[in-house]
Amino acid sequence: MREAYLRCWIFSWKNVWVRPCQRLHFKTVLLQGSLLYTALDSYSTVQAAPKSSSGSVKFQGLAETGIMKMDMEDADMTLWTEAEFEEKCTYIVNDHPWDSGADGGTSVQAEASLPRNLLFKYAANNSKEVIGVVSKEYIPKGTRFGPLIGEVYTNDTVPKNANRKYFWRIYSREEFHHFIDGFNEEKSNWMRYVNPAHSAREQNLAACQNGMNIYFYTIKPIPANQELLVWYCRDFAERLHYPYPGELTVINLTQTESNPKQYSSEKNELYPKSVPKREYSVKEILKLDSNPSKRKDIYRSNISPFTLEKDMDGFRKNGSPDMPFYPRVVYPIRAPLPEDFLKASLAYGMERPTYITHSPLPSSTTPSPPASSSPEQSLKSSSPHSSPGNTVSPLAPGLPEHRDSYSYLNVSYGSEGLGSYPGYAPAPHLPPAFIPSYNAHYPKFLLPPYGISSNGLSTMNNINGINNFSLFPRLYPVYSNLLSGSSLPHPMLNPASLPSSLPTDGARRLLPPEHPKEVLIPAPHSAFSLTGAAASMKDESSPPSGSPTAGTAATSEHVVQPKATSSVMAAPSTDGAMNLIKNKRNMTGYKTLPYPLKKQNGKIKYECNVCAKTFGQLSNLKVHLRVHSGERPFKCQTCNKGFTQLAHLQKHYLVHTGEKPHECQVCHKRFSSTSNLKTHLRLHSGEKPYQCKVCPAKFTQFVHLKLHKRLHTRERPHKCAQCHKSYIHLCSLKVHLKGNCPAGPAAGLPLEDLTRINEEIERFDISDNADRLEDMEDSVDVTSMVEKEILAVVRKEKEETSLKVSLQRNMGNGLLSSGCSLYESSDLSLMKLPHSNPLPLVPVKVKQETVEPMDP
């Protein structure tokens, strides 16, 4: 028989068939059995029929040119790339097939999909609560589990109230593609229960992305009854900007070797073996930290902070607190701060603890589900997400015994951590991205990274760059205005209490003022309106004028009070700040407008009192009022051009970048906006939707129709101040004033020539070419071009007149016959009206009669 079949029964793995593989010089060492099989010159692939078992493990040899070595004990798989994991995988473990009707529907897919060589770890108090996954028997190195199963969400389809604890990111060409959510046990598999590893020593699984799936690979042999703990492989961690497993080991060794005796004593003190580990409250941690000397020399390692920049993918446009965009959770590398650091008389310049900032997903003060989430989530939340024995602070991975001591760090607003600071509360109207997490331990050490000068004033001068505060280069220009300028103090800083210099190391910090006040921050995406301004101000005044004012900011002590887009202008008060959230009944909504609104069919009619234009929403009316007031709060930092809406400014950016993302599929011409492309497509289709109601003329653009209507209305807005001539188009007036005005001082031509030139100017002014050229005036010098053409026409006429006079002299006075070549080209002559006639110069055709000679 030409094919050589090789079937190996591994006695330590029951009911397992090993797939024969095509190999040349094949050698394998059977684990635990130490059995050596060698097959030479076997070139054909032989496929064995595997048994129907969810835990079936299929053997795959490592392809090498010569002798294939199956012994990987010396390989350091933590340094492998995702491609190496996929290529050198030895065993493949498939999920147990799940049938909802097989067991009467008593188990969910996440539990029923567990392979037979694994077991669930249940909580002691609740036998049905899964808190981890352990091995049932020996699992060799190089075994692959997976793929991970869950619900798939793109960045735009994530539910508003989604629990991101079990989110896994999938990348395509180094760019974020979608999420896999394992939260729903009915739609996920057993891999959702695997807990994350917190050090390289405990890690035995590496998470890799192969294609668009997530797999778990064993990077070391796993004995029976050992828990499976996973962390990202090197490539995956690099995409997420997370530390490699080796870096976790460095942190572990640095922290444990500093003082092992003190480390072990605190371990026994904080976590007695007889008491289950649990989450500590802020009060308990303060009690444990009452003796600062105990923690004096612990965690002295200086680890450079890193920021998870790629987590910006989770930002929601509506600023939902469910998906915060920027870092909110701060993890201390050292032990919790001693009480000496918490005193109000803390001197500046004292040694500060180093913080590592992350872009977290929503944290919760309540205990998380016992089963583990993705390692990504474990870095973003310090609350325990696995079993009580695995509640670990992700940034102290080498200290699993101290993991609960940082559980207070994810206390959110309105909870115990922030409430413990008397008299201080964050402004509720701040966008979620601007609100860092606070707690009772170090609210004084959190400062936003503003550049602070010696007098305590903000030194930021760039709105679009925002230099140090480089979070919102374009999304929040109004907020940036409040931070720019050296004369504007930061709204939440007291200049008297600021030091001469403060560090701007990139950590998110914020100092509460000595006398806390509520601060006004304008909304990022809409016009700033004083909804309820008078309700929280003692003094108010409004100007008699009814036009909106520019959206700038003023200061009174430490209170920022921006002007409104409506005409209501409230005088700042030194006693309190305006609060846009707490509105009073007598000052809400449309009542902030400078004029009353009418009602139509019982509904408020949002009508402009200037042009009587109506709108469906109050916000649209407020934006429209800027057109009449001239307010343009959104400025381009390149050309300083102003816009009434943020969307217009963002569209304007394409002018400077030269980007033309929209392409015509007919002629492949590119445009910067969809509106320009839509107008261009009318040239190919011949569509002219704008028709004149007076004449049959049609136009592709409304502006052309608007200019055409002037021909019927005789509207001539452009007038010469010297000779009182008027024109429809501005370019016609410019040609007239360019040395062609008979009453002007710069006129250097004879009056007859000037009269003829002005006749041609008027003829051009009423033509359709003038309408088209006026649209091109920004890119072409229309005035010079028109003047050149008119002078050429006049010059040609003068030459023809000279030729006519010359022929008359040669042939005699009035002896021109009908056969004369001068009139052969046209049997009609042109009679011109005098230039003083206010009517347009329309050519009048008169038939030329034959001149006969008179008798003597």
Swiss-Prot record:
Residues 558-605 are annotated as: Interaction with PIAS1. Interacts with PRMT5. Interacts with FBXO10. Interacts with FBXO11. Interacts with multiple nuclear sumoylation E3 ligases, including CBX4, PIAS1, PIAS2, PIAS3, PIAS4, PML and RNF4, but not RANBP2. Interacts with LDB1, SMARCD3 and SMARCC1. Interacts with EEIG1; following TNFSF11/RANKL stimulation in bone marrow-derived macrophages, the interaction promotes the binding of PRDM1/BLIMP1 to the gene promoter of IRF8. Induction: By lymphokines, specifically IL-2 and IL-5. Up-regulated during dendritic cell maturation. (Microbial infection) Up-regulated in response to Herpes simplex virus (HSV) infection in skin and spleen memory CD8(+) T cells. InterPro entries: PRDM1, PRDM1_PR-SET, SET_dom, SET_dom_sf, Zinc_finger, Znf_C2H2_sf, Znf_C2H2_type. GO terms for molecular function: DNA-binding transcription repressor activity, RNA polymerase II-specific; histone deacetylase binding; histone methyltransferase binding; methyltransferase activity; promoter-specific chromatin binding; RNA polymerase II cis-regulatory region sequence-specific DNA binding; sequence-specific DNA binding; transcription cis-regulatory region binding. It comes from Mus musculus. Keywords: Adaptive immunity, Cytoplasm, Developmental protein, DNA-binding, Immunity, Innate immunity, Isopeptide bond, Metal-binding, Methyltransferase, Nucleus, Repeat, Repressor, S-adenosyl-L-methionine, Transcription, Transcription regulation, Transferase, Ubl conjugation, Zinc, Zinc-finger. Residues 357-399, 532-571 are annotated as: Disordered. It is found in: Nucleus; Cytoplasm. Disruption phenotype: Early embryonic lethality. Compound heterozygotes display germ cell defects and a rudimentary or missing fifth digit of the forelimb. Conditional knockout in lymphocyte T cells show a weak reduction in tissue-resident memory T (Trm) cell population maintenance in the skin, gut, liver and kidney but not of splenic T cells. Double knockouts for PRDM1/BLIMP1 and ZNF683 result in a strong inhibition of Trm cell population maintenance but not of circulating memory cells. Its EC number is 2.1.1.-. Belongs to the class V-like SAM-binding methyltransferase superfamily. There is a cross-link at K847 (Glycyl lysine isopeptide (Lys-Gly) (interchain with G-Cter in SUMO1)). This is PR domain zinc finger protein 1. Sumoylation at Lys-847 by PIAS1 increases transcriptional repressor activity, and is critical for plasma cell differentiation. Can be sumoylated with SUMO1 and SUMO2 by PML. Degradation of the wild-type protein mostly depends upon sumoylation, rather than ubiquitination. Desumoylated by SENP1 and SENP6. There is a cross-link at K847 (Glycyl lysine isopeptide (Lys-Gly) (interchain with G-Cter in SUMO2)). Transcription factor that mediates a transcriptional program in various innate and adaptive immune tissue-resident lymphocyte T cell types such as tissue-resident memory T (Trm), natural killer (trNK) and natural killer T (NKT) cells and negatively regulates gene expression of proteins that promote the egress of tissue-resident T-cell populations from non-lymphoid organs.
